[in-house]
Amino acid sequence: MKAENNSQKDNLHPRNLHRSRYDFELLISNCPELKAFISINKHGIETVDFSNPLAVKTLNKALLQTYYDIQNWDIPKNYLCPPIPGRADYIHYLADLLAETNNGKIPEGNSVMGLDIGTGANLIYPILGNSIYNWSFVATDIYKTSIENASKIIEANPRLIDAVSLQQQTEPRFIFKNIIIPEDRFTFTMCNPPFHASAEEANKSTSRKVSNLNPKEKKNTNPVLNFGGQNAELWCNGGEIGFITQMIYESVKYASQVLWFTTLVSKKENLSSIYKTLKKVNAVSVKTIEMSQGQKNSRIVAWSFLNNTEQKSWKF
């Protein structure tokens, strides 16, 4: 299952609302504070400074308000600020995956229950999943501040109150343990795992991003503050492959309670190891869904312990 190539913006999913250039006039009409961050680039096109964290956060606020009817979205300083178009792609490709075992029809409504691992202070996946397909979510995080901020977003948007529940993972060494209980039944799990294996590696990567976005700027002495992200959002022992490997092993215990386990995989070189681990735990179905946003290529790896008959009999 591979993302379609197309000549439009960023090769985004065909149902993604952000395939065209940003309509800044529309965005500013809904979020006037965005106007202060708009400038004209060398090609005479309106843009924002993507190396400015406040500009990116305000753009996100405007996008969420304009296209997803989310009010008063905000995140604390130094927390990860997600790019909305790419996050929406994960949701849309998940919808396509679910449609495969639902007679080609995307299941919508609150009976579709997702588990978002590491939702962050931004709560972005539950927001998008509920706004686009009316799905329900359990959203988890190890940080109390993230849970508290996500709770504020929910309280400011009545449609989310009954659709999204929050749960703090009190034992950070675990992913699903303490979260999935015997009576739970999840249509899917999703995760954007920590990318790096150390804080030093994360800092170096962020420095490169800042330099690439704004090469004229002097070297930033604290680059992580530009892009945001708490430690567990950016790195963990073992990096991306370590986190995903643990997730796969933990998923075995909940094999009959989840239709599809899924995760983003940023590093293509990790796929071989992931496939070997999935074979080792006897995953019945494994799918790789390629995605592309601009110059960035990533993919979703999805696995299920249910056979084809069990998948098709899953009640949405």
Curated annotation (Swiss-Prot):
An annotated Gene Ontology molecular function: 23S rRNA (adenine(1618)-N(6))-methyltransferase activity
Biological processes annotated in GO: rRNA base methylation
Subcellular compartments: Cytoplasm
Region (Disordered): 200-222
This protein's UniProt keywords: Cytoplasm, Methyltransferase, rRNA processing, S-adenosyl-L-methionine, Transferase
EC number: 2.1.1.181
Keyword Repeat tagged: no
GO cellular component: cytoplasm
Catalysed conversion reaction: adenosine(1618) in 23S rRNA + S-adenosyl-L-methionine = N(6)-methyladenosine(1618) in 23S rRNA + S-adenosyl-L-homocysteine + H(+)
Family: Belongs to the methyltransferase superfamily. METTL16/RlmF family.
PANTHER family in UniProt: RNA N6-ADENOSINE-METHYLTRANSFERASE METTL16, SAM-DEPENDENT METHYLTRANSFERASE
NCBIfam families: PRK11727.1
Biological function: Specifically methylates the adenine in position 1618 of 23S rRNA.
The protein's name: Ribosomal RNA large subunit methyltransferase F
Species the sequence originates in: Flavobacterium johnsoniae (strain ATCC 17061 / DSM 2064 / JCM 8514 / BCRC 14874 / CCUG 350202 / NBRC 14942 / NCIMB 11054 / UW101)
